[in-house]
Amino acid sequence: QYVATTDPEVAYTDVDFVLAHIRVGKLEMRSLDEKIPLKYGVVGQETCGPGGMAYGLRSIPGVLENIEYMEKYSPNAWMLNYSNPASIVAEACRRFKPNSRVINICDMPIGMEHTIARILGFKNRKEMCIRYYGLNHFGWWTSIKDKDGKEYIQDLIAHQLKYGNCLADDDASHYTDSSWFDTAKKVKDIIAIDPTMCPNSYFQYYLFGDDMVAHTDPNYTRADQVVDTREKRVFGECARIEKVGTAKDTTLQIGIHAEFIVDLATALAFNTHERMLLIVPNNGAISNFEKDAMVEIPCIVGKDGYEPLTVGEIPHFQKGLMEQQVNCEKLVVDAYEQHSYLKMLQALTLNKCVPNANVARKILDDFIEANKAYWPELK
């Protein structure tokens, strides 16, 4: 059965799982998230840097509203939340809905693992047993073993130092979108900064911001590309499905994004104790990091929820980067909670993508004007 509705009671009544992925302001606001920082020579990206923080301040009330609907109409349901920017959303959930049945997730590392499995010769990523830690879009793989316990991390490091996260014979023709090929190649530069573990490719925005700005068209950003390609294809097909009332003959294919969230629902429903990468309160899993930080680490998932795996101490370089980033995210949630201009200014000033407080203030003032319909009034 397929039902399309904007009535919360219809949508949320008698459900076991809410698979949530909202975009407050839609792609029109994403375009501004990207273009406003670029005007000042700063990275313009969906979830990283100033754009991600603007998106976060818009997303918080929408995500909280969805949780309230679920708790009203299906109080025993789980919400599996893909809504971005996941770290800021997760911090808001921790702070304002600490007892809610919400699990925040991201498929970006899973997508990289799909390629990593091919690089290392596995049939698929589920043949690998990984160790990973960090924040959302801000982490590192420290171990990749097969089911017999053989370690492959040094093989992956050697490969990434030479090819990035591309196959040895990769070229842009193997990718539906050439920008993802460029992103995979850039891992070669990221891992060279610390070749002891394998980084998430999103570090390109934090560690090589000038390169990203130089190779971005400030008048036609990633949001515009998505509007002109994926949005037309996917939303057009969804509109057709809604009209005919069935997805039987759809041209859309299930990918890693869908597979991962269904695997999580399956683990919760059937107590499979599957090992999955989730965004959860640290609570000492990373022993030398803030206990209340929302970290992305492997967890064992069953009918009662999740159990995080212990990470232990992390090195100074990774810890320093994470402390800077997590406090940017906390300041954004402070700004939402307190309706504080100062807290949002501090968040932008602290962010690694922003060069100084003067630029942070200019970006913030432009964001306030652009987000009048979405942000709380900042005083």
Residue ranges: model-predicted function:
Residues 21:
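Residues lining the SAM
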Residues 66-147:
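Internal, well-ordered domain-core segments that constitute the primary functional module
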Residues 55-62, 108, 256, 324:
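Soluble or luminal CAZymes and related metallo-dependent hydrolases
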Residues 121-379:
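Long, compositionally biased stretches enriched for glycine and/or charged residues
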Residues 24-97:
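Rossmann-fold NAD(P)-binding glycine/threonine-rich loop
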